[in-house]
From Swiss-Prot:
UniProt keyword tRNA processing, yes or no: no
Keywords: Methylation, Nonsense-mediated mRNA decay, Phosphoprotein
Superkingdom of origin organism: Eukaryota
Subunit structure: Component of the SMG1C complex composed of SMG1, SMG8 and SMG9; the recruitment of SMG8 to SMG1 N-terminus induces a large conformational change in the SMG1 C-terminal head domain containing the catalytic domain. Forms heterodimers with SMG9; this assembly form may represent a SMG1C intermediate form.
Residue ranges of the region described as Disordered: 15-42, 83-136, 287-307, 661-734
Similarity comment text for this entry: Belongs to the SMG8 family.
Post-translational modification: Phosphorylated by SMG1.
Protein name: Nonsense-mediated mRNA decay factor SMG8
Function: Involved in nonsense-mediated decay (NMD) of mRNAs containing premature stop codons. Is recruited by release factors to stalled ribosomes together with SMG1 and SMG9 (forming the SMG1C protein kinase complex) and, in the SMG1C complex, is required to mediate the recruitment of SMG1 to the ribosome:SURF complex and to suppress SMG1 kinase activity until the ribosome:SURF complex locates the exon junction complex (EJC). Acts as a regulator of kinase activity.
Species this protein is from: Bos taurus (Bovine)
Keyword field contains Magnesium: no
Length: 999
């Protein structure tokens, strides 16, 4: 054979000339490429097949390649190899990558090696192995390479397996994991990386199964002098896999021209396994210091290496016998070992190899003039002779290069060389004696067959198709069907190879019940997603304390699924929260549709939300209280409850109705918030710019007027034409006319789309809700409020039901002009000029310059307790006949939307009261009181809420009540009430809620 080729190319080339040959055709002499072309001259040779596998160390050249070079006594594999094209590491040399060639193109002996391969298209030429044909793409994750070399002189076919156990392939696999090629561009987690390595072990086992099915002799190469106990597990796995797939292999070779026993056992004979160990440098025996290395003493009977060899043989045999890999009858074993022959060979140790130094030393030896004879031009050396010269002149020996002398460097006797060790077994094959390795009282002879090259190719091709190459075949084809069955049988390897996963699964399975118990501890019957996640986190902590290994993630996911199934199977609490931030107490259910009745027996039940929380609230005007359920939607919170009380209490009172959506189509749609809302800070600045100045800032009060001297008399004034009692808005129909431009919302209200929530500063312009969350009711005329007794309504805490006075200075036209005609009639309620008023106020001011309004900010808690506040965080307390404080402080401040209730319960949680109503007594005077409520129910970026009409002019002579919304909701969800340790001033009613404009 020209040189080593991939086994795939060898079998495909042989199949090509086998299928094209004629009955009279004769073999073509002169050799040729083994991968195709003319048929080889050795097709009728009876061959011995030797398989080589094992592990390699961190060396520049593989021990397997050096072994073949040594046994064949020629350079079959080059000493240096070009770097693997698929290898990205330019600075690391492996057996699949090197920097040059061994030998020269003009070397005659290389005609059967590297030199001849160049002309025949040999892929070994140039250092790139022919195993590239068997190499797959990185994504396929196959790092097993099979190479073949046939030595025609010795009639031995060498099969070399390079797998994940070799340094070069291990390096490629690690780089694929590091770069993400094995994970589709992503780094693999621990469990998937473990699966990757176990997959490579299974692929290696398939290649080993193939070698054990087609070889007579197998060489196990190991880079140390100690036996790797993991091979016992691998061989037991291979034996189990072989017994599993034996019927499939029989089917594959049933038509091959081989013997009956071969077809029955799917192998030419039970292969004999030999072991080659590399002696460590630490165990190398050096000669005594006073002894001349050139003249050693007489060697002892048993050298240390021989004793180590015997010890390894005994150890290996005992291990395999105990694990029943070896039995008395060799025909039933995966392999055999000889009973009366050495099956362990120890390669003498050497220092770390340096092929570059070896070549430099060889160059020196050729260039140094030693004697006159060396001046003569030497004759060209043959390939074999050239190889011997390289060995003799090398400064350091390669891994398996052994001297042919009978003495080692330590003076100990070495019985045979590596070639002699191997050839004693090869000769048994070539002489057709076979292996008689059965032991016991009744040993049964094992079958043996020495095939010709052509017959071996026929059987090996079929096995290669179904065991290795058939992974890419169509599963419907016969070959693909057999391969799929073989691959499905690989699961038998898991019990032998994946011990880590097996232990990990047992460990994780024991940890699962403990994690389940931790999850279910202290659980209510129904609970929410938050409780589920907290309990699951506790269960995972318990699980992580006991679970280990690659199955950790798998059973952690199972724990997730088990806990979720437990929760969703009748233990799932409704996730809906009320507008007061309380959970629905029902288990998972659906809401009744329009006209559908609740059904608790259905699965899931059809029920309305219910948090079992009830509170007491007053109606729009505040005169009647009633219990209310915890609301879950904005309509029930701000409209339905008050509409029910309207029929019993407030229905006959005068209202100022806010504009709402009036559809022009039968099926109006809710609007989508497509407009970009203005920044909250900008809105706040604009609103503050629009905040009106109260009377205390625009006009000065009389210094002579004191709260103690004030009276209830507000005087009688003519009705203002713009705010007279005949204004239709007083009766709830029209709008109060003001000098300001109407709002954009009022001008461009849509009749097609409605606002699904409440009106606030981030809403799209031109949209109105279907109902108003605000209410403005007139309780009666101004005189219906008694300053001394306060409001006569239910639920007020004693001493807190008073309105604060708000004194407003009114300048009449006569006083401003100062020169009235004495002949003209005085204005109503005015004195005749020239006469002083009966009551003289301080500084000579007239009493009729002052008008008094009353303002009250009412807070209400969930238990129906009501009270007024005279300022931020200040509950009103009136002990006498009326409040002493003015309303100016409250009107010029941001009033809190929530305040601590004056009557806290026994619980530790604080109890809050909410601003629900604003009472305003408008005097019958020539002035206008404009109402502009603006509420921010949370810290920024919470928007500002306001009614559908931002500025409302209150008609004179009335006791008006503005009812604030019970809940505030945006498109993103409700604005929940404050919790503990929250700044209450972030929830506020902006100052400027009232302003007075004099006529």
């Amino acid at each position: 054979m020209a040189g080593p080729v991939s086994l795939r190319e060898l079998l495909m080339g042989a199949s090509a000339w086998t299928s094209s040959e004629s009955p009279e055709g004769s073999p073509t002499e002169g050799g040729g490429s083994a991968a195709g072309g003319p048929e080889p001259p050795w097709r009728e040779d009876e061959i011995c097949v030797v398989g080589i596998f094992g592990k390699t160390a961190l060396r520049l050249n593989s021990e397997k390649f050096s072994l073949v070079n040594t046994v064949c006594d020629r350079q079959v594999f080059p000493l240096f190899r070009h770097q693997d094209p698929g290898d990205s590491g330019a600075g690391i040399r492996t057996e699949a990558g090197a920097v040059g060639e061994a030998g020269g193109a003009g070397d005659p002996g290389a005609g059967a090696g590297a030199g001849a391969g160049a002309g025949a298209g040999d892929p070994v030429r140039g250092g790139v192995t022919a195993a590239e044909g068997n190499r797959t793409e990185p994504g396929s994750q196959d790092y097993s390479l099979l190479q073949a070399y046939y030595n025609q002189e010795s009639k031995v076919l060498y099969l070399l397996l390079t797998s994940i156990c070799d340094n070069s392939q291990l390096l490629r696999a690690c780089r694929a994991l590091q770069s993400g090629e094995a994970g589709g561009g992503l780094s693999l987690p621990h469990a998937e990386a473990h699966e990757f390595w176990k997959h490579q072990e299974k692929v290696q086992c398939l290649s080993l199964l193939y070698l054990f099915s087609v070889c007579h002799i197998l060489l196990l190469v190991h880079p140390t002098c100690s036996f790797d106990i993991t091979y016992d597990r691998v061989f037991r796995a291979l034996d189990g896999l072989r017994q599993k797939v034996l019927p499939l292999l029989k089917t594959a070779i049933k038509d091959c021209p081989v013997g009956k026993d071969w077809k029955l056992n799917c192998r030419p004979c039970p292969p004999r396994l030999l072991f080659l160990f590399q002696l460590n440098g630490a165990l190398k025996v050096e000669p005594p210091r006073n002894q001349d290395p050139a003249h050693p003493d007489k060697p002892k009977k048993h050298s240390p290496k021989r004793r180590l060899q015997h010890a390894l043989e005994d150890q290996i045999y005992r291990i395999f016998r105990k694990s029943r890999v070896l039995t008395n009858q060799s025909i039933n074993c995966l392999f055999t070992v000889p009973a009366n022959q050495a099956f362990v060979y120890i390669v003498p140790g050497s220092q770390e190899e340096d092929p570059v130094g070896m070549l430099l030393d060889q160059l020196k030896s050729h260039c140094t003039v030693k004697d006159p004879e060396s001046l003569l031009v030497p004759a060209p050396l043959s390939g074999s002779r050239r190889y011997q010269v390289m060995r003799q002149h090398s400064r350091q020996q390669l891994s398996f290069h052994t001297d042919t002398s009978s003495s080692s460097s330590s003076g100990q006797l070495v019985d045979f060389t590596l070639r002699e060790f191997l050839w004693q077994h090869v000769e048994l094959v070539l002489s057709k004696k076979g292996f008689d390795d059965s032991v016991g009282r009744n040993p049964q002879p094992s079958h043996f067959e020495l095939p010709t090259y052509q017959k071996w190719i026929s059987a090996a091709s079929k096995l290669y198709e179904v065991a290795i190459d058939g992974k890419e075949e169509d599963p419907a084809s016969p070959t693909g069907e057999l391969t799929s069955k073989i691959l499905s049988s690989i699961k038998v390897l898991e019990g032998f190879l994946d011990i880590d996963t097996k232990f990990s699964e047992n460990r994780c399975q024991k940890a699962l019940p403990m994690a389940h118990s931790a999850y279910q501890s202290n659980l209510p019957h129904n609970y929410t997603m938050t409780v589920h996640k907290n309990q699951l986190a506790q269960a995972l902590r318990v699980y992580s304390q006991h679970a280990r290994g690659p199955a950790f993630h798998k059973y952690a996911m199972q724990l997730h699924e088990d806990c979720y199934k437990f929760w969703s199977n009748g233990h799932q609490l409704c996730e809906e929260r009320s507008l007061t931030d309380q959970h629905c107490v029902h288990k998972f259910h659906s809401l009744p549709k329009s006209g559908e009745k609740p059904e608790a027996d259905r699965n899931p039940p059809v029920l309305y939300h219910n948090s079992r929380a009830r509170s007491t609230g007053a109606c729009n005007c505040g005169r009647k209280q009633a219990p209310r359920d915890d609301p879950f939607d904005i309509k029930a919170a701000n409209y339905d409850f008050y509409q029910l009380l309207e029929e019993k209490c407030c229905g006959k009172l005068d209202h100022i109705n806010f504009p709402v959506f009036e559809p022009s189509t039968p099926d109006p749609a809710p609007a989508k918030n497509e407009s970009s809302p203005a920044p909250p800070d900008a809105d706040a600045d604009k609103l503050k710019e629009k905040e009106p100045q109260t009377q205390g800032e625009s006009t000065s009060l009389s210094l002579a007027l004191s709260l103690g001297q004030s009276t209830d008399s507000l005087g009688t004034y003519p009705a203002d034409p713009q705010a007279g009692g005949d204004n239709p808005e007083v009766h709830g129909q029209g709008e109060v006319k003001t000098e300001k431009r109407p709002n954009l919302v009022d001008r461009q209200a849509s009749t097609v789309e409605y606002l699904p929530g409440m009106l606030h500063s981030n809403c799209p312009k031109g949209l109105l809700p279907k109902f108003s969350s605000w209410s403005l009711v007139k309780l009666g005329p101004a005189k219906s409020y008694n300053f001394h007794t306060g409001l006569d309504q239910q639920g007020f805490i004693p001493g807190t039901n008073y309105l604060m006075p708000w004194d407003i200075v009114i300048r009449t036209r006569a006083e401003d002009e100062g020169d009235l005609d004495t002949n003209s009639w005085p204005a109503p309620n005015k004195a005749v000029p020239g006469k002083r008023s009966a009551v003289v106020m301080g500084r000579g001011r007239r009493r009729d310059d002052i008008a008094r309004a009353f303002v009250g900010f009412e807070y209400e808690d969930s238990r129906g307790r009501r009270f007024m506040c005279s300022g931020p965080d200040k509950v009103m307390k009136v002990m006498g006949s009326g409040p002493k404080e003015s309303a100016l402080k409250a009107l010029n401040s941001d009033m809190p939307l929530y305040i601590l209730s004056s009557s806290q319960g026994r619980g530790l949680k604080p109890h809050y009261a909410q601003l629900m109503r604003l009472f305003v007594v408008v005097p019958d005077a020539p002035l206008q009181i404009i109402l502009t409520p603006q509420v921010r129910p949370g810290p920024p970026p919470c928007p500002v809420f306001y009614p559908e009409k931002q500025e409302i002019t209150l008609p004179p002579d009335g006791l008006w009540v503005l009812r604030f919304p019970y809940a505030y909701v945006t498109e993103r969800g409700p604005c929940f009430p404050p919790k503990e340790n929250v700044q209450l001033m972030s929830y506020k009613v902006l100052r400027g809620v009232l302003k007075a404009v004099t006529q």
